[in-house]
From Swiss-Prot:
GO terms for biological process: tRNA processing; tRNA re-export from nucleus. This is Exportin-T. Keywords: Cytoplasm, Nucleus, RNA-binding, Transport, tRNA processing, tRNA-binding. tRNA nucleus export receptor which facilitates tRNA translocation across the nuclear pore complex. Involved in pre-tRNA splicing, probably by affecting the interaction of pre-tRNA with splicing endonuclease. Belongs to the exportin family. GO terms for cellular component: cytoplasm; nuclear matrix; nuclear pore. GO terms for molecular function: small GTPase binding; tRNA binding. The gene is los1. It comes from Emericella nidulans (strain FGSC A4 / ATCC 38163 / CBS 112.46 / NRRL 194 / M139) (Aspergillus nidulans). It holds the Pfam family Xpo1. SUPFAM superfamilies: ARM repeat. It is found in: Nucleus; Cytoplasm. InterPro entries: ARM-like (IPR011989), ARM-type_fold (IPR016024), Exportin-1/Importin-b-like (IPR013598), Exportin-T_C (IPR045546), XPOT (IPR040017).
């Protein structure tokens, strides 16, 4: 069988094997893993002499491991595995001159031995560490650890055991953690002294020998120190050995592998300081280890001092020392923060903080961002501590300036692009993203500094900005773009402090000292020669700052023309990233400064004319497999067009400034509209013939038209009176052409989803420009937007738009709504009735149901309910009621059910006539006359619905959403009672409630409560009543 297993492993691992044979081999090996006797064959294969191939042995041992972990090997058999492997280890690792296994096999054996340790150390293998330590001698009579093969294997197992039971980063179940804790306790009692002594012996005997042995020993000490007696590591013998290894840092040249030994020695000190202990003990430990001296000596070593700013700089060592600094300072700050710590301890901690400040600054200001990032946590802790101190005692804030100022200067300097940065290169996108993430973290630290000492922060940033602009004034384009970018970035962040009161100005004056400084900075920037901003990064920053602090221009309106001119130049930037961002920022700026801009419309339209030419491009076939959507990719054609739309809106804003006469507004609008109309006409024929690019071109044209309209007026129904927000009648008339052009395209191409999407977008924007002028066209819009192929999602979105139209024009829409309601709702009913397939479909169906009910509520709440029961729409009335009844009984969709009851209550209020029962307060009032027979209709059709939903088998009356639905159902019953009075009470008493099997006493309690409580009271009562019944 061994030969058969070996053969199967060879076939499975051979890339040239026949696929059928390989599949059979994999099936066989998978069966072997679950076979209770399979591990025995594999154990024999692994220990066989002469040995099998490395691959066979690796897979064989993997099967043994798998069987052991799956519980297929009982305790007695685990002992057998132990004995076989121990014999193998003694033969291969326990004597000199044998041929060692490759590292992957050694790791696999160490993994198996670690599992056996977990299972047997407390249950039959008490000599575990003695057995392993015996491998470290060449012979039983040897008194030194002189067998390198055995030592390396022993250390592999030691480190593997820590990973299994001591590594806090490993996620374990509660049972696994309890077992790990028990094993650690057992080791501490039985063997810990012996293990610690072995580390000392190995380090002592091999300190100048095998670097791998020393490195593995140091890693073992560093990992185990977190859960063993600290005295086993922090003693003179061990510390002398550790300091000897730290001495390697002083070497200018290291042999291969020696740097890992040095770094591992530093890591041991980091782990010692990271060990959990009382704050007082930790401070004493830091002082005892003289870590200030340790860090200082390594920092001044050739790899970190002489080689700094050269290609030989050792970033690995710098990061390793930075970890030690970070851990140490974090614990120093923790001691300072604890209120229970003694004054003497705090004094010591303060002293340590002062001596460690140069080390913090050294690594925080390191040229390499990964080194700087390593100490950010301790800098954050330190600054947060100082903020807490300053908050409790503001008078001491200035005392911390000796700490704050150098940290702040380091923060500012680290925010500068380094000399190797090449901004904007596609190849450097990852580096750029990482740098921006670092800037964000540094910005957070800077804000903490500002919170501790705002004046110090204000002075430091002001100095950087003022010096930079002065240098730019003197040297112009000679200024390094990185310095200007830094100053602008600091200006951008400064606003967090300058505008914390809510705005830059208060009654025309800067809102505080920081705001005053920011105004000074803005003046320096805006009055600078834009031509000095030669780098794309600084050009972008310039625009971002102008937009962020646009309120600055409210009191410096004379600067607006120059800024607009700068933006128009940058809108033509040769770099696409800058250009498209400029389009967006230009729109933001003119929107915020609309009331302060003079008549520059003609200049702007002429300057941007070449950028308003629309050129649709179909996505390339190669982009189909790209995981990133085209809209996310700033260089994609979709993203460029989306940015271009901002220009159309900006043009609309500038052309509709109130100071421009209406006839001029029309002229400017037509200068933009006409080329788009011509383009649509030119492409319509091809689009009808199925030309995909022509369809996309018309989609883009319609989107542009709608966006231009939004620029002229962003009024939305319901926000304010249209009379005060709509453009002049002449302008509205000009945009009627937009509506007509869009409808012509939509009517020709309504089978296209993209055209419907663009048209719906344009419709929503045109409402704000046309007002009630759009109403006569509503039937055409509905016909084009709600087709046989329209999705539920499209219908829901359009229903939402119609709600706005109804709200905005309720006094003018009745006749149009009366004419279009029946065909419109028939399409909605069709969409609701269509079968669903998949989760997305279910979501869209639920959304359509809710928007349909919202639409009915909009009609009823705006006194247009008569349209539902008009002579023209009467044939559809029963279908409307039936759909609502169906939704009200849906226990799978409580949100829709709740809305359905709301609609029925609103119908009752609208058509049930005047209230005849008392205590109907806090319900919706209505002045509408009664609909003949509707009262009886409510009793027989609406009332039973209140009981149908809770009668559903899956209904849970205690569910929070279910309670909300029941409250609405209770509200409906109270509405029926308010309209029908005793007639409804008698119906409940004589027919409905007894028909459900309710006893006479319960019926009387129920109808008595209904007649006694008001609407709010009964809404609360009904869910409680249903809970009682269900219990």
């Amino acid at each position: 069988m061994e030969e058969q297993v070996a053969n199967a492993i060879e076939i499975a691992g051979n890339p040239t094997s026949d696929s059928t044979l390989k599949a059979q081999a994999f099936d066989y090996l998978n069966q072997l893993r679950t076979d209770p006797s399979g591990w025995q064959v594999c154990l024999s294969l692994f220990t066989k002499d002469p040995p099998q191939s490395h691959f066979i042995r690796h897979v064989s041992l993997e099967v043994v491991n798998s069987a052991a972990q799956a519980g297929l090997i009982d305790l007695r058999s685990l002992g057998f595995v132990r004995d076989r492997l121990l014999a193998y280890l003694r033969q291969v690792y326990g004597r000199e001159g044998s041929n060692p296994d490759p590292p992957n096999i050694q790791n696999k054996i160490a993994q198996t031995i670690t599992f056996l340790f977990s299972a047997l150390y407390g249950n039959g293998w008490e000599s575990f560490f003695d057995d392993l330590l015996s491998l470290t001698h060449k012979s039983p009579s040897s008194t030194t650890r002189d067998n390198p093969l055995g030592i390396i294997f022993y250390l592999r197992v030691i480190n593997s055991i820590h990973d299994e039971i001591g590594d806090v980063l490993v996620s374990r179940s509660r049972a696994e953690q309890e077992r790990a804790n028990a094993l650690k306790d057992l080791i501490r009692v039985r063997d810990m002294q012996k293990i610690a002594s072995s580390w000392q012996e190995i380090l002592s005997q091999w300190m100048d020998g095998d670097d791998l042995i020393v490195e593995m020993s140091l890693k073992a000490v560093g990992s185990w120190v977190s859960w063993i007696d600290i005295g086993l590591v922090v003693n003179q013998t061990m510390l002398d050995l550790l300091f000897q290894q730290l001495g390697r840092a002083q070497k200018a040249e290291l042999r291969e592998g020696e740097d890992k030994v040095r770094d591992a020695a530093v890591d041991v000190f980091t782990e010692i300081i990271g060990k959990k202990m009382k704050a007082e003990d930790k401070i004493d430990m830091i002082a005892f280890l003289n870590l200030d001296n340790v860090v200082g000596q390594i920092s001044s070593s050739p790899p970190l001092y002489a080689n700094r700013f050269t290609s030989k700089y050792d970033t690995d060592l710098a990061e390793t020392v930075a970890k030690l600094v970070n851990t140490t300072v974090t614990d120093i700050v923790r001691a300072l923060e604890q209120e229970t710590v003694s004054a003497q301890c705090k004094e010591k901690a303060n002293g340590l903080l002062q001596v460690f400040l140069p080390h913090i600054l050294r690594y925080f200001s390191d040229e390499y961002d990964e080194v700087c990032s390593t100490v950010i946590p301790c800098v954050s802790d330190l600054l947060s501590y100082l903020r807490k101190m300053a908050k409790s005692n503001p008078s001491i804030a200035s005392q911390h300036s000796s700490i704050l100022l150098p940290i702040l200067k380091a923060i500012i300097q680290k925010m500068r692009y380094d000399e190797t940065a090449s901004w904007g290169d596609d190849d450097d996108q990852t580096d750029e993203a990482e740098f921006q993430e670092l800037r964000k973290r540094l910005g957070t630290l800077q804000q903490i500094v500002a919170a501790v000492d705002e004046r110090l922060y204000m002075e430091a940033v002001s100095e950087v900005v003022a010096t930079t602009f002065e240098n730019m004034r003197q040297s112009g384009a000679q200024l390094d773009w990185r310095d200007l970018d830094l100053a602008l970035h600091e200006m951008y962040l400064f606003g967090d402090s300058a505008t914390k009161s809510g705005s830059l100005y208060n009654k025309g004056q800067p809102s505080g000292p920081s705001a005053e400084r920011l105004v000074e900075m803005m003046l320096r920037m805006v009055e600078s020669d834009i031509r000095s901003f030669t780098h794309p990064a600084t050009q972008l920053q310039y625009m971002e700052i102008c937009v962020r602090y646009s309120s600055f221009f409210h009191t410096h309106t004379h600067l607006i023309p120059g800024v607009l001119e700068s933006f128009l130049q940058l809108a033509h930037h040769p770099m696409k990233k800058v250009k498209t961002r400029a389009w967006y920022l230009f729109q933001r700026l003119v929107k915020q400064l609309r009331a302060y801009i003079d008549n520059v419309a003609q200049t702007v339209v002429e300057a941007l004319g070449d950028l308003l030419v629309i050129q649709a491009e179909l996505p390339s076939e190669s982009s189909d497999g790209d995981e990133m959507s085209s809209e996310d990719h700033e260089g994609s054609t979709d993203a460029v067009f989306n940015s271009q739309l901002y220009l159309f809106e900006a043009v609309g804003i500038i052309c509709s400034i109130p100071t421009i006469p209406a006839d001029k507004q029309v002229l400017y609008a037509q200068s933009v509209l006409s080329p788009v109309f011509v383009d649509m006409e030119k492409n319509l024929g091809s689009a009808k013939s199925g030309d995909a690019r022509a369809v996309l071109q018309i989609h883009h044209d319609i989107m542009a038209l709608g966006t231009l309209a939004r620029g002229f007026s962003d009024w939305q129904p319901g926000t304010s009176s249209p009379a005060t927000q709509l453009p002049a009648p002449e302008v509205s008339e000009a945009f009627s052409q937009v509506s007509e052009a869009t409808l012509v395209a939509l009517e020709s191409l309504k089978a296209s989803f993209d055209i419907r999407t663009a048209s719906r977008f344009a419709f929503s924007r045109l409402i704000g420009v046309l007002g009630s002028r759009i109403l006569p066209q509503l039937p055409r819009w509905i016909d084009g937007l709600l087709t046989q192929t329209s999705s539920r999602d499209e219908m829901a979105l359009f229903l939402r738009l119609l709600d706005q139209v109804i709200f905005g024009f309720k006094g003018e829409i009745y006749n149009i709504l009366d004419a279009l309601l029946m065909p419109f709702l028939q399409r909605v009913f069709s969409g609701i009735a269509d079968p669903t397939s998949g989760t997305d479909d279910e979501i869209h169906l639920a959304e359509l149901k809710r928007e349909y009910l919202n639409f009915l509520l909009a009609v009823l709440n705006n006194d247009l309910g008569a349209v539902i029961i008009s002579e023209r729409n009467q044939p559809m009335f029963d279908t409307v009621i039936t759909t609502i009844e169906h939704f009200a009984k849906d226990a799978e969709d409580f949100t829709t059910a709740k809305m359905a009851f709301s609609v029925l209550s609103r119908m009752g209020s609208a058509w049930g006539g005047p209230d005849i029962a008392p205590a109907a307060s806090n319900g919706p009032s209505t002045s509408q006359v009664a609909l003949p027979g509707f009262g009886q209709f409510m009793i027989t059709r609406f009332s039973p619905l209140c009981w149908a939903l809770p009668a559903t088998p899956s209904f849970n009356a205690k569910d929070a959403q279910a309670k909300q639905v029941l409250a609405e159902a209770g509200g409906l019953q109270r509405t029926i009672y308010s309209k029908m009075g005793m007639e409804y009470i008698e119906y409940l008493r004589d027919r409905e409630l007894p028909g459900m099997g309710m006893g006479a006493d319960l019926v009387e309690e129920y109808v008595g409560t209904l007649s006694r409580l008001d609407l709010r009271g009964f809404r609360q009562f009904f869910p409680q009543f249903i809970q009682r019944l269900s219990a």
